[in-house]
Amino acid sequence: MYNVSHDGSNKKILWQEMLRHEFESALEHKPIVIIPDGSVEQHGPHCPMDVDISAPFHMAAEVARRVDDFPVIVAPPVWSGFTHYNMGFAGTISLQLETFQALIADICRSIHANGFERIIAVNGHGGNAAPCRAVSWK
């Protein structure tokens, strides 16, 4: 999933691949951090379990790759979501609502504590929309 095509520019866009001095340099240019969030759940016989996180991750990576006006950094994806209604199906992994919201809030607080002020969550799972919105109001 983390295999992101490179265009030869050697532009690092993935949080987990960056070095400390690269973060410090990026902060000077008021970067945006994108947090892909989704879920691992059943999607019937036609889709893999990771479709809800794979799509926002690759979308975020493509945006980060294409934007040159300022740094865009893709945070590690939040692959565990709120999908309790699919727990009757094999392959589904769900967090409790409070756990999911606390996870998103803690990740945002941690990113902000690193000096990043512009944070965008890109959601790929419908069940996460309202919980993410509630966290954004805090």
Tell me what each language-model feature is.
Residues D52-A64:
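Short catalytic helix/loop segments, enriched in acidic residues and glycine
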Residues M1-G44:
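Active-site and ligand/interface coordination hotspots across diverse enzymes
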Residues R65-P71:
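Short helix-capping segments at alpha-helix termini
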Residues I35-H43, P76-V78, F82-Y85:
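Short, conserved active-site loops that position catalytic residues or coordinate cofactors/metal ions
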Residues P31-V33, P71-I73, I120:
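Structural motif
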Residues K12-M18, S80-K138:
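Active-site histidine-anchored catalytic micro-motif
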